[in-house]
Amino acid sequence: MQPNRRETLSLLAGVAPAALGMLSAVATTNGSLAQETKPNILFMLADNVGYGVPSSYNGGILDTPTPRLDKFAAEGLRLTNFNVENQCTPSRAALMTGRLPIRSGIGKAIAAGAPGGLHPWEITVAEMLGDAGYRTAMFGKWHLGAGQGRLPTDQGFDEWFGFETTDIIYWAGKPGMPLRDVHYIREAKKGETPRNIRVYDEDTRRQVDRMLTDRAVDYISKSRSGDRPFFLYVPFAFSHHPALAHPDFKGKSPGGEFGDSLLEHDHNVGSILDALTAAGLSDNTMVIWASDNGPSPLPTVTPQWTIGDAGPWRGEIGTVLEGNIRTPCMIRWPGRIPGGRVSNHIVAILDFFPTLARIAGGKVPTDRPMDGVDQSAFFTGKQENSNRDHVLLFLGQKLMAVKWRNFKIHLDGLDRVDGVIEDWSFPRAFNLAADPKERWNIIWQNTWLGEEIGPFVAAYEASVKKYPNLAGGQPNGEPPRYGAENAAAETGVEAVPRKLESIRQH
């Protein structure tokens, strides 16, 4: 049934700042949630873990228990409508900057060895928190550029141990692959040239998450006597294909290689949480666990490439179907975030930048469009509703869909990451509450949906006219100047007005 128009207009007015892609120009967050002793922040990011993988989501479809993740979920807030971007690089760019990745020319994952990545001009969450007095460390997968000036220690992290991307493990040791294409686990501190630690091959892939966990545990232990709060970012290799478990977990689950890897991941998360407890830091540490994308099911390759499950949703990585863009996310902060809470309100990975700024007393940039919204009051239970009711979903440089409340309006179609985008002349709409597989088009009975999403698209387009999206792969050097000379060729929404008009005509 069509919602009350007064209610709709009121709600639209309330989200206007988010729709415009701009946060209020509040330079600091004094009087915020930041305590006299600022909280530590620990962010653990899993790779391609679908909605149906943790037992606390959908009952654990894979029959592999995740007791530590389940306990963690029960101790805080479990989000069931957490939204990410279409692939690894865009999701990580959104997390780091609080901006739609298309604004920086990032539309898809960066291929191993390819140029580009997050421009040094971007302000990352690590830089923002560092300026707010935090020590910053990252142990894990970056996937936001491997060139000079684009590694984690160039983008706000005091130290980094990890790897640029995961696909590169297939190259090492293979016949015909030149030595220059061998990649390594690397390590650096700010201002240093990264050092090669170990060849990143399939054997190392089995070991790497244990290595990251050990680094995180050691960092937390040493932080017991620290005089400054820390921001620790741990983006695991799990569960990016191929699923390769540590030898200690080989054959320990009923779920094959992937199940073994899942058991290991649950154990690693538990080890890091136990380190917080042992150091006496649990009560003053905000901990976030999330996944950057949905599953990557490729059973035609090898069993090790068949990873994860999207639960009740349809879709896989590289699409904007719910199975990819709706992933598990859990947040714990004892005494500040009520335990045992579950919410189906829309939250986006974009929202962590302004939310953490509010919590830590950091500054949000005011010289560029910001798309994330502050969710601190929602997370801490001071308000029931999220400050977001919609997300714009891009693929490459193209707006593919708009999700608003329980409705999803697809402007074009793509069912598989290796498929071809279908250019639809008429949008399709789905009621996610009744149709989680996004199969039953309801646009003919609900043409009014075009009027609802129109303002969101128009607001984004207006912001792009003022601050043109940057072309991808921009070189290092001077900060980009907003203007035609640096603008991307397309905004990603050129065809949308025509498609929305086709709805109005019916």
Walk through the language-model features, giving the residues of each.
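Formylglycine-dependent sulfatase
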Residues: 2-423, 427, 432, 436-506
